[in-house]
Amino acid sequence: MHPLPSVALLSAIGAVAAQVGPWGQCGGRSYTGETSCVSGWSCVLFNEWYSQCQPATTTSTSSVSATAAPSSTSSSKESVPSATTSKKPVPTGSSSFVKADGLKFNIDGETKYFAGTNAYWLPFLTNDADVDSVMDNLQKAGLKILRTWGFNDVNSKPSSGTVYFQLHDPSTGTTTINTGADGLQRLDYVVSAAEKRGIKLLIPLVNNWDDYGGMNAYVKAYGGSKTEWYTNSKIQSVYQAYIKAVVSRYRDSPAIMAWELSNEARCQGCSTDVIYNWTAKTSAYIKSLDPNHMVATGDEGMGVTVDSDGSYPYSTYEGSDFAKNLAAPDIDFGVFHLYTEDWGIKDNSWGNGWVTSHAKVCKAAGKPCLFEEYGLKDDHCSASLTWQKTSVSSGMAADLFWQYGQTLSTGPSPNDHFTIYYGTSDWQCGVADHLSTL
């Protein structure tokens, strides 16, 4: 990691307002700022989405680093692909942004019920042909929406060839955003592939869980606890620096359906004000960077009072109040998840009431509702089919089953027992039959 610019250098940069300072963004498809770097620095192309001011004599660079402090100062290092290898084909798919239209979504000029899926692992593939194959199959099936991870946080640099998006270093108290070939360029390819096929992406920006680092990766580098993550000023400044890097990168892409603040945010034992205040602040920040795309919470939908049976998911035990969070001014639609087995619910038909409860809250708020994750381990059809029918009849805007699977060049995609593999008998009863009714 290069050292941060000196005070003298920063002062010199401030005197040249029309030029970009060291390691600053100087180009890219979504970029509208200055393109000229300060003396001694050159604007270097990473890919069609991102160019950065690098030392004029540098032949290789690395990832963009953000300090924990709210300062905009940053450092970087990472291998820069040549313009010929990093340039992606010009997308030819749909060109309109997804919008809310009453209690439904308008996608490519159509306001109706949509179906989709989750494939969290897609940006972590290193073979472009595998990404293309997944997108081709989704397009053939008629699955219009894909939710995939926009985060991958580590506390130490992984082995060569392993994809990661951010390195939170506990030894230095710094965070490095990886914009290289094993970093955000993998997400670049997913976005580009989705654009060409008219697939719309939902992208959460941090994980509540420790998979792929999550909030605890920040805590390990900056201290505090997971429940303090939402209010820790150092952590939030680093989180917002990452938001800015990703959201600005794809601000003009029609492939993005919406940004999600997190995947399944929880703050066990906290006042619901903690998550609400963070939701309101962060969603407003995203909208200030990107007015083109919608914003959602990405949460499980816990803390519902409408038709509550008093069970764990309806409670605010995890610090979340669904209606309260949905009411945040810059949240465009509601999302919720359904996992009866994981929540200790014995009767799968309970899920139908869970769906209709959320539909009622969304209707009262005047915002669409997305049945964002649902599934059963191994038994992929019995209850899921009923949940899907309830989703359609209750006025939901769309549903996304968890999760999509297929054979890749390296073998089967991840199987967490919820996975429904493309072309199998479970695919027919759990996915194709549902799509045929829409």
UniProtKB/Swiss-Prot annotation:
<feature type="compositionally biased region" description="Low complexity">
    <location>
        <begin position="61"/>
        <end position="86"/>
    </location>
</feature>
<dbReference type="InterPro" id="IPR000254">
    <property type="entry name" value="Cellulose-bd_dom_fun"/>
</dbReference>
<dbReference type="Pfam" id="PF00734">
    <property type="entry name" value="CBM_1"/>
</dbReference>
<feature type="signal peptide">
    <location>
        <begin position="1"/>
        <end position="17"/>
    </location>
</feature>
<feature type="binding site">
    <location>
        <position position="149"/>
    </location>
    <ligand>
        <name>substrate</name>
    </ligand>
</feature>
<feature type="region of interest" description="Disordered">
    <location>
        <begin position="61"/>
        <end position="92"/>
    </location>
</feature>
<dbReference type="InterPro" id="IPR045053">
    <property type="entry name" value="MAN-like"/>
</dbReference>
<feature type="domain" description="CBM1">
    <location>
        <begin position="19"/>
        <end position="54"/>
    </location>
</feature>
<protein>
    <recommendedName>
        <fullName>Mannan endo-1,4-beta-mannosidase F</fullName>
        <ecNumber>3.2.1.78</ecNumber>
    </recommendedName>
</protein>
<keyword id="KW-0326">Glycosidase</keyword>
<dbReference type="Pfam" id="PF00150">
    <property type="entry name" value="Cellulase"/>
</dbReference>
<dbReference type="GO" id="GO:0005576">
    <property type="term" value="C:extracellular region"/>
</dbReference>
<dbReference type="GO" id="GO:0046355">
    <property type="term" value="P:mannan catabolic process"/>
</dbReference>
<feature type="active site" description="Proton donor">
    <location>
        <position position="264"/>
    </location>
</feature>
<feature type="region of interest" description="Ser-rich linker">
    <location>
        <begin position="60"/>
        <end position="96"/>
    </location>
</feature>
<dbReference type="InterPro" id="IPR035971">
    <property type="entry name" value="CBD_sf"/>
</dbReference>
<feature type="region of interest" description="Catalytic">
    <location>
        <begin position="97"/>
        <end position="438"/>
    </location>
</feature>
<feature type="glycosylation site" description="N-linked (GlcNAc...) asparagine">
    <location>
        <position position="277"/>
    </location>
</feature>
<dbReference type="InterPro" id="IPR001547">
    <property type="entry name" value="Glyco_hydro_5"/>
</dbReference>
<feature type="binding site">
    <location>
        <position position="339"/>
    </location>
    <ligand>
        <name>substrate</name>
    </ligand>
</feature>
<feature type="binding site">
    <location>
        <position position="402"/>
    </location>
    <ligand>
        <name>substrate</name>
    </ligand>
</feature>
<feature type="active site" description="Nucleophile">
    <location>
        <position position="373"/>
    </location>
</feature>
<feature type="binding site">
    <location>
        <position position="263"/>
    </location>
    <ligand>
        <name>substrate</name>
    </ligand>
</feature>
<keyword id="KW-0378">Hydrolase</keyword>
<dbReference type="GO" id="GO:0030248">
    <property type="term" value="F:cellulose binding"/>
</dbReference>
<keyword id="KW-0964">Secreted</keyword>
<dbReference type="GO" id="GO:0016985">
    <property type="term" value="F:mannan endo-1,4-beta-mannosidase activity"/>
</dbReference>
<keyword id="KW-0732">Signal</keyword>
<comment type="similarity">
    <text>Belongs to the glycosyl hydrolase 5 (cellulase A) family.</text>
</comment>
<keyword id="KW-0119">Carbohydrate metabolism</keyword>
<dbReference type="InterPro" id="IPR017853">
    <property type="entry name" value="Glycoside_hydrolase_SF"/>
</dbReference>
<comment type="function">
    <text>Endo-1,4-mannanase, a crucial enzyme for depolymerization of seed galactomannans and wood galactoglucomannans.</text>
</comment>
<keyword id="KW-0325">Glycoprotein</keyword>
